[in-house]
Every structure is written in C-alpha cells, then in structure tokens.
C-alpha cells in the first residue's frame, strides 16, 4: 500500500521555507531546538482561538524574533497591545533571551490549510454534518482562486460504530510535482464519539524560479518558406 510523504518536508529548500531560520554551534543546537518547540507549544495553547496559521522563529544575535501569522491579529495584539506584551515577556522567559513578537495578517484564510482544517474541526465539534463542512471549505477555496483542494476526514463519522475515512477533492492536487506550491495541514475534532482527524491539501499553483508560474503562451512557429511550383523542365 502506497504511503504519502509530508508535502512540506519533501519541498523544503525547493519551494517551501523552514519554519525556524537560525544557525547554532553544536553545543547550542539542542537548546535552541528545544526552545523553539516550547515557544510554539506555548503560543499555540495561548492563541487557540486566534486563528494562528503558523509561527516562524529567527534568532539574531542572542535574541529571539517570533512572527505569528494569524487571520485575527486584533485578538493577538489585544487592547493597546497589552496581550502581545504579555506574550513577549513569556516567550523571553521560556527562551532565556530577549524576545521580539511580530504579527503578520493572513489575508485569505480560506486558502490556508491550517485555518481550513481548524474551521472544519470546529464545525464537526458543533455537530455540523461532515460532508457539508467539507464541501463548504472546498467551495470557498476554489472561489478564492485555489487551483485544487483535497479534504479528508477520518474517524467515527456521524457516530458510526466503525471508523472510516472519506475525502472530497476539486481541481488538481499534484503531490509528486516538487515545484507545485501545496499547503498541507491537519487538525483534530474532539467529539462525543471520539477524535476525528482532518487533513487538508491546497494547491495554489506552480513556482518557477521563486515566482508563481504564469501560463505560457505557445510560441508561434515561423511559417515554412513557400515552395516554387514545379515546372515542366528548364527552358
């Protein structure tokens, strides 16, 4: 049975950037890696309702710079920036170095795999029919310009005795094409029947040379030279 590699992992350094960008010596690497893990775990727990897409971490000159990509920046910042200041203090304490928090707004949450998966999971927890939630997410993504999207849910769907998986796809999702910009993420819905897993793949187009590919127009071939009509011989 074929297995699927993680769409981000196989594209790292090709069309996908790393979520942590820093360089460390051998003796500091493990501490930095553990610090990144703890910072992400803390922020995801604190900002559970803030529609956080991803968290990127940089470590310039014995400090830490955290960028939070969210669809609801107002919730993260808080009144007069109070909440973000509390986060900065907590992150500095966890990392053990001065911290800086940046907020980046996600303009189109319908095209972000993490936010789409979280949305479907929250609907399943509110007892929305799973097929309706899947179809709504697919339609919204395609309406906003996605080239393709696939959604899969697994578990005791509809309270069934036996767990199963169902998926819905529209457009094309080329998992083997390395230059394809595919956003992938997962979420969990905790229902009364157990946990339902949600997976989302969104194909946004192909990337060539660091830029989105543009549909190339077929080159016009030069017209072949006209042949002189055959005569009956030389005069």
From Swiss-Prot:
Pfam families: KH_2, Ribosomal_S3_C. One of its GO terms (molecular function) is structural constituent of ribosome. Signal peptide: none annotated. PROSITE patterns: KH_TYPE_2, RIBOSOMAL_S3. The keyword Repeat does not apply. One of its GO terms (biological process) is translation. Residues 39-107 form the KH type-2 domain. CDD domains: KH-II_30S_S3. SUPFAM superfamilies: Prokaryotic type KH domain (KH-domain type II) (SSF54814), Ribosomal protein S3 C-terminal domain (SSF54821). GO terms for cellular component: cytosolic small ribosomal subunit. It comes from the Bacteria. Keywords: Ribonucleoprotein, Ribosomal protein, RNA-binding, rRNA-binding. Gene3D superfamilies: 3.30.300.20, Ribosomal protein S3, C-terminal domain. Part of the 30S ribosomal subunit. Forms a tight complex with proteins S10 and S14. Binds the lower part of the 30S subunit head. Binds mRNA in the 70S ribosome, positioning it for translation. Belongs to the universal ribosomal protein uS3 family. This is Small ribosomal subunit protein uS3. It comes from Actinobacillus succinogenes (strain ATCC 55618 / DSM 22257 / CCUG 43843 / 130Z).
């Amino acid at each position: 049975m074929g297995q699927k590699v993680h769409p981000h992992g196989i594209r790292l350094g090709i069309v996908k950037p790393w979520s942590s960008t820093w360089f460390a010596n051998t003796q500091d690497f493990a501490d930095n890696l553990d610090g990144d893990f703890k910072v992400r775990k803390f922020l995801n727990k604190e900002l559970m309702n803030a529609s956080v897409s991803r968290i990127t971490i940089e470590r310039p000159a014995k400090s830490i710079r955290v960028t939070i990509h969210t669809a609801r920046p107002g919730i993260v910042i808080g009144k007069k920036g109070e909440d973000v200041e509390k986060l900065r203090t907590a992150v500095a304490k966890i990392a053990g170095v001065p911290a800086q928090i940046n907020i980046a707004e996600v303009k189109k949450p319908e095209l972000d795999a993490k936010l789409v998966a979280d949305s479907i999971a929250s609907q399943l927890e509110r007892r929305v029919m799973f097929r309706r939630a899947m179809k709504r997410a697919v339609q919204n993504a395609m309406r906003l310009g996605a080239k393709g999207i696939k959604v899969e849910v697994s578990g005791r769907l509809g309270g069934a005795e036996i767990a199963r998986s169902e998926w819905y796809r529209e457009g094309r999702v080329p998992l083997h094409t390395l230059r394809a910009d595919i956003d992938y993420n997962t979420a969990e819905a905790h229902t009364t029947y157990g946990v339902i897993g949600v997976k989302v793949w969104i194909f946004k187009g192909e990337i060539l040379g660091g830029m989105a590919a543009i549909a190339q127009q077929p080159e016009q071939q030069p017209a072949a030279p006209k042949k002189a009509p055959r005569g009956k011989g030389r005069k």
